[in-house]
Amino acid sequence: MSLTFSDGPLSGRPPERVNYRIEGPAHKLLMHDFPRRVRATFGGQTVLDTTRAVLLHETGLPPQLYVPVDDIRADLIRPTDHHTYCPFKGTASYWTVTAGDQVAENAIWAYPEPNAESHWLQGYAGFYWDAMDEWYDEDERLEGRLRDPYHRVDVRRSSRHVRVLLRDSDTVLAETDRPLLLSETGLPNRFYLPAADVRQDLLEPSGTHTVCQYKGTASYWSVTTNGRKLTDAVWSYPRPEGDSAAVSGYLSFRHDDLTVEVGSPPA
């Protein structure tokens, strides 16, 4: 489970079926070492290169990478007058990154004098992920953010009967007895259906793409039928990553005007 979401031990509603108690404030922080080399580039320059990064887990938030200030290219950054305050960490100072003719305003922050309860943040800085051009985990370029080591994606073959219908209609968009079931930490199960079991004649590429750091880049389709157009109602991962690799070529459905019927497992 993720530490800070769903029923994780550092979430706002930790699990009840446990034999322990977690003492401490309602908003909890946990920092631990990140085990691999991390780099960030901007404007053709390597702004950050470190093997000493840490991950900060914070109640209700995704993990945030922090890196030693000494591992950031000092010649590419300058302090600004911008400051923010966090009641759990203290007052943050900010830096702008300049590389060639590219500028990322207030892209880096740090807590020069963190609160006593988070004193271990001193000497570390965080980056706004999208402010940099590229991020690398060892030599692999990252799609989306750095992965949460406590987040899982599992894909399993299933023989459940799955049918996708246009709501308030008998129009069937897809039907299969051979779906894949994708379970992801903190999210509801999703069924992915073979493309051969989907009414391709009702689908039109929408041009929308989204990036998930756990599954890869998704492509979307809109459904047009019975005079109705359901935008971005179908998606697929053409080149899924890691534990999601099995869903390549499969499609999933979600839209307020669609009903996904799932039958009981066969006896």
Regions found by a protein language model. Give the residues of each.
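Terminal leader/tail segments of proteins
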Residues: 1-267
